[in-house]
Every structure is written in C-alpha cells, then in structure tokens.
C-alpha cells in the first residue's frame, strides 16, 4: 500500500466527514498526506471541520501503524483499496462532485463495466415484479452490460441473481465491505464477488443505517449510464437513485405497472423526469441509452467548490 493510499484510508475514518468534506480538505492542502500533517488551527480555518474533527485528524496521523495493519488485513481478505486518483477508478463515478475518494473493492472492476445499468426497486415487490427484475437483469447481462444494484431484499437481489445467470453484476453496499446487509444475502454477495465486484465507501465494520443506505444510492447512479426502476411505491430509496441519475444527466426508465400499489410510484417517477416503459421495452431502451455518450462533466455536476454543504457522513 502506498503512502498516499494509507493517508486516504486514515482520512476515511474521520468521524462525521463525508466525501465532499474530505475532497475539499485534500484539495486545500494538496494531498491526503499533507492534510493529515496540517496543524489543527489550519484545519479549523478551512471551515469544513469542527475543532473536534480537526483534533481527530491529528490523532489519525499518529496512528499510522493501525492503518498499515488494517490495510494488510483487508488485502488478506481480498479487498482492494481504490482511490479517486487511481487510473482504474470507475470513470462515470468520478464525474460526481461527491464521488467517494476511497472505495473498498472485493472482486474485480473491468473496463467493460463502463457500460453498466442500475436496476433498482422496492424491497417488497409483487411476484411479478421480482420476476421482472430477474428477467431484466439477465437480459442486460446477456447483452454484455454490467448490472449494478444495492444487494437489498426484493428487486435488488432478483436483479443480481438474474445478471449472474448471464454475466456480471456489481453490488454497492450501504455498510462496510465486511458486513453484508442483509445477512441472508451473504451467499449472493460471495457469488457477485467471484464474477463481478462488491463496493463500499465505508470503513470496515460500519453497520448499515438509513443515512449510509441513502448515500449508497448516489454511487449506484454514478457507476451507471442509465437507471431502471423495476417496481416501487411512491416513496423509498429508488427515488434517491433516480434523482441523482437525472441530476447527472443520465436517463431513468420506470417500468409501468397498473396495480394501484405501484402505479403511484410510476406516476411520481414520471413527474420527476423518468421515461415510463413496458417491461418488454426496458432492456432495448437501456441498451440504447448505455451506448450514448454521457454529458460532459460541466453539464452533469457542479464543480466541487460549488457543491452544497449537505454531505453524507457517518
């Protein structure tokens, strides 16, 4: 592990600091190593950290041996550390103003993953919705696209299983890389890691919370060129994923359902800017969108300096 990666690993453990805060911190001091070595008063003067956080940075800098040992344990467990500065960092994710500065990766990321589609939806789909998620996942993978989802119960799990039947899948965790949530998907996670990848931005040992799961949704949107919402009600995490995709200029497809339980979700997504399609149209529409170029970064996201103070932290 390089000295720079070690510094990113240490900063990733700063309490209450999310991706935007960490990127501003490193931008101000020029490198993660310099940020760790900065005097407390300069850290406070930056305006992004509280005095307690600034003192915590100082403590992290003094604990290099701990993070070196953590790095060795992660490597032994098959986990790679990938920083925003690495050439093989996911290219579409890099465009987000709040892209994670550090990813924990179990499995492999390949160049072909640049053509990826997120398949998301409710944790409690109808039997028809679960079947649709599996069919869409398998059809996308059979066309050579990587299927991205969040490993949750319901639509996510069905989409992952469908994709694995024909190709690759990536699961974005809302917990540490060593804490699969839900636990009943540990076997599925192992399958995904063997042929695709598990990703997390969270320090090892972090438990999933509402906040970390919401933060996870932006990564799903950022990794992909198009999002398919298979089935959802009129609220939930699918809307967060769809909103971030649309903000980044990436299309969202919502599969139409006539059942009252799910019709409201489709209607709300359409008002948000999603294109409503029938299931039989979804895969072809996603393939067309995935083959189109992404908007240039200036159009897709605000510059880091213009990013709002809202930050995902844990």
Language-model-derived ranges and their functions:
Residues 1-5, 84-314:
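Glycine-biased, small-residue-rich flexible motifs in mid-sequence functional cores and linkers
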Residues 1-86, 272:
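Short, small/acidic-rich helices and loops at N termini and domain boundaries
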């Amino acid at each position: 592990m390089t000295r720079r990666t070690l510094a990113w690993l240490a900063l990733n453990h700063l309490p209450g600091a999310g991706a935007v805060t960490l990127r501003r911190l490193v931008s101000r001091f020029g490198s993660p190593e310099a940020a760790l070595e900065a005097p407390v008063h300069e850290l406070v003067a930056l305006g992004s950290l509280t005095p307690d956080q600034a003192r915590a940075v100082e403590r992290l800098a003094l604990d290099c041996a701990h993070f070196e040992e953590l790095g060795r344990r992660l490597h032994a467990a098959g986990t790679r550390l990938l920083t925003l500065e690495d050439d093989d960092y996911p290219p579409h994710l890099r465009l987000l103003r709040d892209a994670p500065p550090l990813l924990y990766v179990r499995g492999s990321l390949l160049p072909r993953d640049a053509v990826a589609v997120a398949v998301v939806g409710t944790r409690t789909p109808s039997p028809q919705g679960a079947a649709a998620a599996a069919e869409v996942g398998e059809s996308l993978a059979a066309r050579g696209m990587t299927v991205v989802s969040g490993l949750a119960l319901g639509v996510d799990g069905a989409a992952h299983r469908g994709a694995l039947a024909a190709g690759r899948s990536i699961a974005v965790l809302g917990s540490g890389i060593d804490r699969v949530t839900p636990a009943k998907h540990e076997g599925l996670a192992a399958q995904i890691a063997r042929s695709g990848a598990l990703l997390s931005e969270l320090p090892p040992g972090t438990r999933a919370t509402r906040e970390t799961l919401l933060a996870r949704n932006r990564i799903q949107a950022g990794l992909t060129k198009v999002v398919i919402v298979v089935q959802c009600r009129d609220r939930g995490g699918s809307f967060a994923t769809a909103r971030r995709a649309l903000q980044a200029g990436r299309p969202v497809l919502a599969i139409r359902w006539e059942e009252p339980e799910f019709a409201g979700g489709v209607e709300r997504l359409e008002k948000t800017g999603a294109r409503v399609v029938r299931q039989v149209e979804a895969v072809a529409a996603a393939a067309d969108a995935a083959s189109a170029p992404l908007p240039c970064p200036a159009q897709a996201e605000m510059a880091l300096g213009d990013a709002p103070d809202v930050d995902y932290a844990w």
